Amino acid sequence: MSAQAGRRWLRDSLPAGEPTSPVIRSGEGKKQQAYTRGRPDLYLDDDLFGYMIAVKADDAGAKKGESKTFMRDTVLATGTLVSVVPSKPVMDFGTMSRDFEPGTHPVIHEHEMYTADLAGDLLLDLPRVGTFETGGRTTKAALPGGLAEEVIGKGGSEIVLRDVQCVRLPIEERRRRVAVLLRTMAMVKGGAKQSAHYGDRTPGLVILAPIKGGTNPFTRVVREREKATYFDADVLREEIDAWADELDGPVRIGWAPGFLGSQRDRAGSDLADLMKEERVVLGHPRTVLNTLASEIESGDHDSWFDDPR
């Protein structure tokens, strides 16, 4: 499943009271453009998912064809969800024949179907949540100068993050946005043609860890073994030891009961010593995600919002 589809599911699953950035469409034919409003100060999805806006300059004295470009690299990086074990799609044929006259040929349609355990990586760059670039030699501004001043006027601050001048929202709003995202992950829904293919889309297994850098060392924990999805507790244990200097808290495993059969109980036994040392937490995905969201919202992990470099 494409990363774009996964991001669409997350965006569509945001709480009903969370406003999303309006989409603007302009131009005609081959010169059409579509982009969001580009206001990460106002909209959580512009902040976390990023955007790019390139429009013709309307400033007095602007040269013909000159454009204004504002861009925000994604704060939430997502990978393509790929089947852990090779799975061959099959063709499903359907017909539409309701109210057709007797002897009339039905309308035939087909689509591909598959069942698979899909896995992918995800990275949330916490120091950049609610932090917007205003300029730099090699960095496009996320906000024009006037809006940057507006952020500061509403309680924001000016900072330098990774050698780039930025404005930053108050910590309370930054905490809230991360908490909303985590709770959305716990109840994500989506998929096409749900009238016929409705099903649970919430994660069966999540591995969460606060890492000081941007490397995910746990991509090989869930793998194929004997043509089945396998959780390798030995790999997890060795990666935790190898990356101990980069980990800034326990590794949290959210694992739905019944997913992968008895492997959940076996992993709990294999990792019992790490759980006793509070280096690993094991629970239901919804419980793990919601608990972490509450901890972040209450300010228990504010140090994660500061760049460690």
Describe each model-derived feature in a short phrase:
Residues 1-309:
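RNA-binding basic/glycine-rich loop and surface signature characteristic of RAMP-family CRISPR effectors
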